[in-house]
Every structure is written in structure tokens, then in C-alpha cells.
Swiss-Prot record:
Gene that this polypeptide is encoded by: pyrG
Protein name: CTP synthase
GO BP annotations listed: 'de novo' CTP biosynthetic process; CTP biosynthetic process; pyrimidine nucleobase biosynthetic process
Major enzyme class: ligase
Function, in words: Catalyzes the ATP-dependent amination of UTP to CTP with either L-glutamine or ammonia as the source of nitrogen. Regulates intracellular CTP levels through interactions with the four ribonucleotide triphosphates.
């Protein structure tokens, strides 16, 4: 029988509800419990797939091909549970499903309202997403008091009553600001945030108080008194040197004991030695490298959240401090490749649209001609193919049809047909909707023996996640291969190019898939580990 921990946030947004939830989940998992996590997003978009990275940050792709909130990336990095499309849903998705049922006549002519129809659909999705887990942590996006969050909070209130207090807890994150002129932390914002929650029928069981300064015992006692929360359930969570320390911080304050006692669960003690190892390797590196990351969304680094974390994980595995030099590809176009001087490796991540593409192509040329280790991901592979066609084959007009539909040598084009993660055939044209029409989710890839990528994975067949609608044009592939471009990975059916490598280069790998989505701090990822090792070798520190 599943128990539920509902996680809300107050005072301000971006307090780290996702990381706090994932950290608690990691402790409970370490105690031997089966864990799952859900993220409920209050926005009207059906999913974040077509939202600007500048507004929403990264779109995290699940194993089954769902385009979801970046918090699901945090979940998968902290726990071993694999997330699916059931672990994230939005207001838009809920309303779409309810309206579809109304059109079918499922409500038998009833007046469709927020209560009960919308709240019932939210509750149904929460229960479905929880599955057979021992504990499901359910994070509600936004801040208490937001008008968009009201249906979700009402659904939680109802669900707590329906399943009973012994199966439901509410954990509320708040901000306890430090006022430098007064020299003290202030509890009033937390008091008001809890008052707002209680006004809609929700009493927190646990308060996680975020602060950039220590919260003393008297402040915690005051918070407990005014919010009707046990003093030991007022958890102080200061800023830390690495997010992977947070499980230990929460465990030291007994948060997992509070949960286990409340739910009456029988389980062992938490073994956090894996997390201790991660923190030690992260904070005590033995060497360091500098890697240039050339992208087009550098104003909001959350657009590359999983990728940045994957580079950190690779550093943890080899006890290497990975210094990322963030470079906007438009700056390369305006200032030239001198911005890349002095780096030990170059990384070009994915992206959409024409802006900044020529800067990425110049970056690839610089890496290839100067024998600097290069890793291209998604668009980073496509620009590698375009660069090779232009500067090795001499096709000066080579391009992708995404950027130039009249190109005489469209070496990258729209995929018109493929199989999705379920095995069903998908067909797309230029006129297809942008939302939900890409090649998404886990796909098999066959690796060629004797290649760099095969050396990294040490496998003939791998499974990685995809998010793209353009691919290498098979009609021009023979000329590319004849000119030396190495095709080191193909889709499971052999129809699509998945990985390319440049000849006569110490380490040049470009892949169509997104390996960052499966990298974790405890296990790392073979491709990123190979990339960092290549950077170490290039710098002479291997």
C-alpha cells in the first residue's frame, strides 16, 4: 500500500523542491524502500516540449519518450527508479484529458467543473503514477498562493482525507532569509506561508527551511510554535558546497526517521556510503581539465542541466575537476575561434533553430583541425557532419534542411518515418505539429567494433534516449564515408546514423542521442568518462 509525501513550496520559487524531494527519496531508497517520484506542473502547456529553454530550462526525456520537467532529471540522478510519462503531468494535460472525456460523453451530461472533475483527474493521475511503490513523493510546482496551483492543492487536500493521515504527509519548503543589517534570520515569511497553506485545509507535517545562514535552535523553536509543526520536524537546509551532500544533511537531522515512524514502515537503516564517496570525489579532485561548452542558450544554464551534471559525474568517476567554459556560439560567429584557445576539449550540445549554428560549425572545424577532443550531442552531431561535408568534401553549400531548405547538399534532413519507443511507426512531414512529433525516448544503437565509441561502452548494442526530428541524409552518406567520415553507430534497424567519428583524430565523437539523460553521480556514464579521459590525455594530465 503506497504512502504519499506531498511536497510544496512557499515564499519564493526556485527553493529547490526537486532536489530536496530527491534527496529524501535517496535516503528512503537507501533504507530498502521502493520509491517513486512525481512532478505536477501548474502551467497550461500540455508538456514542456515546445517551451523556450530560456523560460523553462531543459526538457528532460524519459525512457518511454515523454518530454518532461527538468526535475525528473534530478529524480533519476538521486534514485535508481526510472521515470516514465506517468511521473510528470501539467494543468494542460489534465484539462485536455477532461475535455476529451466530456466530448465523448463520459460525464453523462454533467456540468464539468474544477471540483470534482479536474481534481478527480489529478488524483487519478497521482495514484496511477505512484504505482506499487512503498513511498511516492509528489512535488507540486510553483508556490503556495499561485492561482495556477489551486486545483492541485485542493486535489491533495481531498486525497489526504480519502487515504487517511497514516498514508499521507505534507512537506513544505520555505525560505528563512538572513537580514544582514539586523544580523539575524527572519521566520515571518515562513509563518505566513504556512498560514496560507492552512487556509486551504493543508497542515504541513514537515518544514524544510532554506537559508544561506545557519538557523539557530531558537528560530526553529519559534517556527514550530507558530506553524503547529513538531520542533524536530523543522529541518534546516542551508546552502551546501554540492547538492549531493543534501541526503546526508537531511539524514543527520532525522527526516527519514520522521517519515518511517509516521508511516509505520519496517525497514533497515540508511547506508549513505555511496553518497559519501560521491561527495569526497567531487570535493577532493586529483587533477583538472577545462572544457569549452559551445551552445546557444548560455543565458540560462538550466537549459543544459543534465549535461552539466553529466560532466560533473564524469569528473567524479576519475577524481577530476571539470571546469566548463561556457561560450555562446553567436560569440564565436562575431569574435572567432580564439575564444576556444587554451581548452582541453570541446563540447557542442543540442539545440533547435538557425541562430548560432554557424558558430557551432566553426567550433567543430577548430576542434577537428587542431586535434582537440570533441564531443557533439544531437545538433552537435549534425553540425559535425555539415562541417565535414563543407571543409573535407568541398560542398560549400552543405547544410541541414532545418536551416536551408534549398541547400544543394542537404547532408541533414527531416526524418519522415521511424519507430517510436513502443515500436509503433511514426510518420512526419514539414507540416506536422512541433509538439510531440520528434523521435523520442530510448532507442537501440548498434556500435561498430574498433571505434572510439565502442571502446567507451565496451558493448555492441546500447540503448540511449533521443529527442530530434532531423537526421543524417542517407542519400549523401556514401560520399561522406568515402571522404573518410566514420559511421560508428547506427539505429537498431540500421536505417539511421547515430554516431560519427572523424578520421585521423585522437578523440572526435558525435552522437545523435542524448547520453546525459542516463548519467548519474554514483555510476557516471561511459561516453562522458571517455571524453574527460581524452581531455586529460590531451592536457598531459592522464
Amino acid at each position: 500500500m503506497t504512502r504519499y509525501i506531498f511536497v510544496t513550496g512557499g515564499v519564493v520559487s526556485s527553493l529547490g523542491k526537486g532536489i530536496a524531494s530527491a534527496s529524501l527519496a535517496a535516503i528512503l531508497e537507501a533504507r530498502g524502500l521502493k520509491i517513486t517520484m512525481l512532478k505536477l506542473d501548474p502551467y497550461i502547456n500540455v508538456d514542456p516540449g515546445t517551451m523556450s529553454p530560456f523560460q523553462h530550462g531543459e526538457v528532460f526525456v524519459t525512457q518511454d519518450g515523454a518530454e518532461t520537467d527538468l526535475d525528473l532529471g534530478h529524480y533519476e540522478r538521486f534514485v535508481r527508479t526510472t521515470m516514465t510519462q506517468n511521473n510528470n503531468f501539467t494543468t494542460g494535460r489534465v484539462y485536455m484529458d477532461v475535455l476529451r472525456k466530456e466530448r465523448r460523453g463520459d460525464y453523462l451530461g454533467a456540468t464539468v467543473q474544477v471540483i470534482p472533475h479536474i481534481t478527480d483527474e489529478i488524483k487519478r493521475r497521482i495514484i496511477k503514477g505512484a504505482g506499487d511503490a512503498d513511498v511516492a513523493l509528489v512535488e507540486i510546482g510553483g508556490t503556495v498562493g499561485d492561482i495556477e496551483s489551486q486545483p492541485f492543492l485542493e486535489a491533495i487536500r481531498q486525497l489526504r482525507v480519502e487515504i487517511g493521515a497514516k498514508r499521507a504527509m505534507l512537506m513544505h519548503l520555505t525560505l528563512v532569509p538572513y537580514i544582514a543589517t539586523a544580523g539575524e534570520t527572519k521566520t515571518k515569511p515562513t509563518q505566513h506561508s504556512v498560514k496560507e497553506l492552512r487556509s486551504i485545509g493543508l497542515q504541513p507535517d514537515v518544514l524544510v527551511c532554506r537559508s544561506d545562514h545557519p538557523i539557530d535552535v531558537s528560530s526553529r523553536r519559534k517556527i514550530a510554535l507558530f506553524t503547529n509543526v513538531e520542533e524536530r520536524a523543522v529541518i534546516a537546509l542551508e546552502d551546501v558546497d554540492t547538492i549531493y551532500r543534501i541526503p546526508s544533511v537531511l539524514h543527520a537531522q532525522g527526516l527519514d526517521d520522521i517519515v518511517v515512524e509516521r508511516f509505520g514502515l519496517e525497514c533497515g537503516q540508511a547506508d549513505l556510503s555511496e553518497w559519501d564517496r560521491v561527495v569526497d570525489a567531487k570535493l577532493n579532485p586529483e587533477r583538472e581539465v577545462t572544457i569549452a561548452m559551445v551552445g546557444k542558450y548560455m543565458e540560462l544554464l538550466d537549459a543544459y542541466k543534465s549535461l552539466i551534471e553529466a560532466m560533473t559525474h564524469a569528473g567524479i568517476q576519475s577524481r577530476t575537476k571539470v571546469n566548463l567554459r561556457y561560450i555562446d556560439s553567436e560569440d564565436i560567429e562575431q569574435q572567432g575561434t580564439s575564444l576556444l584557445e587554451g581548452v582541453d576539449a570541446i563540447l557542442v550540445p543540442g539545440g533547435f533553430g538557425l541562430r548560432g549554428v554557424e558558430g557551432k560549425i566553426s567550433t567543430v572545424q577548430y576542434a577537428r583541425e587542431n586535434k582537440i577532443p570533441y564531443l557533439g550531442i544531437c545538433l552537435g552531431m549534425q553540425v559535425a557532419v555539415i562541417e565535414y561535408a563543407r571543409n573535407v568534401l568541398g560542398w560549400s553549400d552543405a547544410n541541414s534542411t532545418e536551416f536551408d531548405k534549398s541547400s544543394g547538399h542537404p547532408v541533414v534532413g527531416l526524418i519522415t518515418e521511424w519507430q517510436d519507443a513502443t515500436g509503433a511507426t511514426e510518420i512526419r512531414t514539414e507540416a506536422s505539429d512541433l509538439g510531440g512529433t520528434m523521435r523520442l525516448g530510448a532507442q537501440e544503437c548498434q556500435l561498430q567494433t574498433g571505434t572510439l565509441v565502442h571502446d567507451c561502452y565496451a558493448k555492441d548494442v546500447i540503448v540511449e534516449r533521443h529527442r530530434h526530428r532531423y537526421e543524417v541524409n542517407n542519400n549523401l552518406l556514401p560520399q561522406l564515408e568515402q571522404a573518410g567520415l566514420k559511421i560508428s553507430g547506427r539505429s537498431g534497424d540500421g536505417a539511421l546514423v547515430e554516431v560519427v567519428e572523424a578520421p585521423e583524430h585522437p578523440w572526435f565523437v558525435a552522437c545523435q542521442f542524448h547520453p546525459e539523460f542516463t548519467s548519474t553521480p554514483r555510476d557516471g556514464h561511459p561516453l562522458f568518462s571517455g571524453f574527460v579521459n581524452a581531455a586529460l590525455k590531451y592536457s598531459g594530465k592522464a
